[in-house]
Amino acid sequence: MEYGKCRGIERGMGRRDFLKAATLLGATAAGAGMLAGCAPKSASEAQAQTAPAATGGLDPADVDWKYETDVVIVGSGSGGTCAAIEAAEAGADVVVFEKDKAMYGGNSALCGGYMLAAGWSTQEEITGYAGDTGEAFANQMLRWSQGLGNQDMIREACLRSGEAVDWMMDTGRTYEGASPLPPVWSCGDTEADVVPRSVYNHNAYGATEGHMATLKKRAESLSNIEIEMGCEVAHILKNAEGSVIGVQLADGSFAKARKGVVMACASVDNNLEMSKDLGLMQNVWGLTLEGAGLLAPGNPDMDSNTGDGVRMLREIGAELCMQQAVCMNDSIYVGGISDWGMSEILGKDVNIHDSSNIDAILVDKTGRRFCQDDAEWGYVMHECAQAAWKQGFTPDDPTTGYIFYVYDATGAPFFEMKGHTPDTCDTTFSADSVDGLAEFIGCDPTALASEVERWNSFCEAGLDADFGRRANMAPIATPPFYCDVVRPGPMGTFAGAKSNVEAEIIGLDGNPIPRLYGAGCIIGGNVSGAFYFGCGWSITNTVVWGREAGRNVAALEPWE
């Protein structure tokens, strides 16, 4: 693999400052180039060069191609790298353009490298659980989707998930265990759905040792993959027949793709204005609170993920597929994993990463609980966002979006471990009585006290009659009492192109756009619903659909 570098966006710019500069809806070609820090020859020249791209009338013979290759891949994350590997191993020459100057792999390099899967070859060996199937996995995920997204793609991702984990192991990745996803009772889960599918290796994660490092090493072994860092793609190019023939970079140069283009960039993660325009309510809530200083350490996301891919896809007439789901957790890890009784079910201890839910309840600004707060964390964070909007959240006043943990002295050590104390954190408050917390929350003291009393009665009975919570049924009864604001940490949205099980991107006419494929979060709306499906779902889909896109684009005959 060869590396190059062209001018691109500088890392390290503050997110809020960057967002002000990076609202790309309706941006001209010149504007896109300037925002990226690239240098077209002139504004008028850049506009003239790129006008045919948007109308689909570009003549390849009239273009001065700086790059000529078989396959262009936009984005170096897991989806893009999997596509590059498959295309290169099929004999295609590949160029990967990465917007960031320094970080290869995007969000995939920052995540824990979990994969969510069923039926991989070592599942029984490392978990003690036998007989899991992709079909059982698919049935649960389809229920969780609630009919949203592409049902065929969700099912197919689950059916291929075990193969995807095995492929990663063949590539050099190792796994040490797997955790079950906490069930979501409102989506029809039962104890039979508590299966260890979230596979991990906590001794090898991140950019240097984990999932992305494994893929990067394999890509580097292939001489027909070229990586261009700091090269922002600004436009997708189509010819007069409507086929994709390449891309234009933000510096005004052009890259020919003789076989096709794979869009594998992120979604609108850190673009607040675009999130508002697209109605991505959970992301708007998360970005607003994060922008107000309620940061959630440990929930990384690339500042350069600002919706470029969505803008480019709209330019060429791609159909969009957007879901409310956001890969988002908070600094306390609400909805954390426990073994959910699996040791008892199997009659032996199982190798499960246990980070079980905390001794706290979640309440809104009325002082009332609103969800099953021990469910899978993607579901819980979605419910927090929904509760915030229902209570009158407006982005102009972040405090209107506050959701609160309520706990007592028994639960305090866990929060202290996370750095949340009244002395060190201005969103943590303590009082000698539950009534005293109401002033900080801004609710009726009687309502809050009644809710805590009701919760305590559920703990005594061993049954949460309101929402079915089962983990950490601990009463809130030992003073001092605490409340703490939830700090949402957005890590990735799922708004982008509509696609199919061949990883082809669909146009507004309902047909695949010739020679255009997608993988990663830019096609994540197809495999998502109202809430994120849990640790490893994104990475599994990047592997499944990245490989599919790479194989299929490499199999095409060149257009010249």
Swiss-Prot record:
Record annotation: effect of changing residue 82 to A: Decrease in catalytic activity. Still binds a [4Fe-4S] cluster
Membrane topology term: Peripheral membrane protein
InterPro entries (alphabetical): FAD-dep_OxRdtase_2_FAD-bd (IPR003953), FAD-oxidoreductase_2 (IPR050315), FAD/NAD-bd_sf (IPR036188), Succ_DH/fumarate_Rdtase_cat_sf (IPR027477), TAT_signal (IPR006311), TAT_signal_bac_arc (IPR019546)
Subcellular location(s) per record: Cell membrane
Stated consequence of mutating residue 535 to A: Decrease in catalytic activity. Still binds a [4Fe-4S] cluster
Coiled coil (UniProt feature): none
Top EC group: oxidoreductase
Catalytic activity, EC: 1.3.2.-
NCBIfam families to which the protein is assigned, alphabetical: TAT_signal_seq (TIGR01409)
Family in the record: Belongs to the FAD-dependent oxidoreductase 2 family.
Chain's role: Involved in the inactivation of the cardiac medication and plant natural product digoxin, thus decreasing drug efficacy and toxicity. Catalyzes the reduction of the alpha,beta-unsaturated butyrolactone ring of digoxin to the inactive metabolite dihydrodigoxin. Likely uses the cytochrome Cgr1 as the physiological electron donor, encoded by the adjacent gene in the locus. Only reduces digoxin and other cardenolide toxins, such as digitoxin, digoxigenin, ouabain and ouabagenin.
Listed PANTHER family: 3-OXOSTEROID 1-DEHYDROGENASE, FUMARATE REDUCTASE
Protein name: Digoxin reductase
Organism from which the protein derives: Eggerthella lenta (strain ATCC 25559 / DSM 2243 / CCUG 17323 / JCM 9979 / KCTC 3265 / NCTC 11813 / VPI 0255 / 1899 B)
